[in-house]
């Protein structure tokens, strides 16, 4: 029941939730920057977005629930190991230890890539809105945007 409330809240307050979303993103960034211990060879970038009303409707028309109205992508690069995929799990564990997550929505596309070779971890956190967090390294991100996994569906 609580989950339905958050999902409905996301749908109804897509634009009203912008300040809340931005505040949550700042909290996540600050926590990762100040509390997560990682090597100097790793740099982290963040991309956030709010799904457009058109994309929400398209997803509903495909008979899917739009859990990902609010999204944050965490992209890291390890200058010593460009293929470092283990750091994604460190970030995921850190997020899971600091936020309320919905385990049954968790997807591990790093260990189990999609057919189109898409790789990323998807974690969903509940604040007063539901936020999808995608965690991937820069090579995975390049493939998602420009490579074999660049198709949207």
Residue ranges and their predicted role:
Residues 1-153:
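Nucleic-acid processing machinery
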